[in-house]
Amino acid sequence: MPEQGPRMNGFSLGELCWLFCCPPCPSRIAAKLAFLPPEPTYTVREMEAPASTAQQPPREEGSGEPAACSLHLSERADWQYSQRELDAVEVFRWRTERGSFLGCMFVRCSPGSRYTLLFSHGNAVDLGQMCSFYIGLGTRINCNIFSYDYSGYGVSSGKPSEKNLYADIEAAWHALRTRYGVTPENIILYGQSIGTVPTVDLASRYECAAVILHSPLMSGLRVAFPDTRKTYCFDAFPSIDKISKVTSPVLIIHGTEDEVIDFSHGLAMYERCPRAVEPLWVEGAGHNDIELYAQYLERLKQFISHELPNS
């Protein structure tokens, strides 16, 4: 999987002043600290309508109407599969309540499977870079995967912000349910790194089949200042205060040598979570290499195939 971003702590005094004083606003702090959108690695093009329907009025984006779109990957996307696999990837754009149009992707890895992962990726990648990983993961754990780019990432319009992050996953949730008819009891929310923030927020408001938190953070301030012991009013991404409201089963995965989001964050989230299942603490793993350890796939398979209902 592509790297999910650089270190987020260990700032100099000058950097801290820039983060928290220009201006001292949580959303601006969050954007400076957490969002690193790469140069887009893909485009989404709407295909020409057949001659018989060419005179019909254009479809409104985000309306839930099926639209024929094609995915075009750049060389930076590092595509690893054949055209047959690429044909199993559907892309479209969906409007959020805050006015952004999100790039969305549905990967049919396992058509007969019960579960679909709603995957919120890390802070320094886009769908083009993640597409190959999604196909490999979904095939191995027998799940389809739905993902989306945050506002300001990939082909998604708007700018990255904490408020947009929550609106983005809300739109993705409704797109998955409306466009593909996937019901909540068949949706597994999967968040990685910064993607755990919208995942916890959504899971605290909607019940689903399960939640997977991969390298989660307690809050933005606790990443920048590891000695922080409580949530302040100006903190960003306060997942630690929301996790207690999650009523679905939660699997937490964290590397013990994570150099970006300390292992203590995963432990604290696990201890605060009312429906946590047996976690996966990957001994020696950092922030960007958990997927390389055999126990990663083993634990996911065990959780999805044996600990969740599959009838």
Swiss-Prot record:
Any one biological process term the GO annotation gives: regulation of postsynapse organization
Q: Which residues form the active site?
A: 193, 258, 287
| UniProt EC number | 3.1.2.22
Keywords from UniProt, A to Z, are: Cell membrane, Cell projection, Endosome, Hydrolase, Lipoprotein, Membrane, Palmitate, Postsynaptic cell membrane, Synapse
Compartment list = Recycling endosome membrane; Cell projection, Dendritic spine; Postsynaptic density membrane
Q: List the disulfide bonds.
A: none
> Which GO cellular component term is one of those annotated?
plasma membrane
Q: Does the keyword Lipoprotein apply?
A: yes
UniProt PTM comment: Palmitoylated on cysteine residues located in a cysteine cluster at the N-terminus which promotes membrane localization.
This protein's membrane topology, according to the annotation, is: Lipid-anchor
Q: Kindly report the protein's main subcellular placement as a broad class.
A: membrane
Q: Which reaction does it catalyse?
A: S-hexadecanoyl-L-cysteinyl-[protein] + H2O = L-cysteinyl-[protein] + hexadecanoate + H(+)
Taken from the record, one Pfam family name reads Hydrolase_4
Give this protein's Gene Ontology molecular function annotations: palmitoyl-(protein) hydrolase activity
Disordered: region residues: 48-67
Task: Tell me its family.
Answer: Belongs to the AB hydrolase superfamily. ABHD17 family.
Function, as annotated: Hydrolyzes fatty acids from S-acylated cysteine residues in proteins. Has depalmitoylating activity towards NRAS.
The protein's name: Alpha/beta hydrolase domain-containing protein 17C
The record lists the organism as Xenopus laevis
Q: What is the lineage of its organism?
A: Eukaryota, Metazoa, Chordata, Craniata, Vertebrata
Give the gene symbol: abhd17c
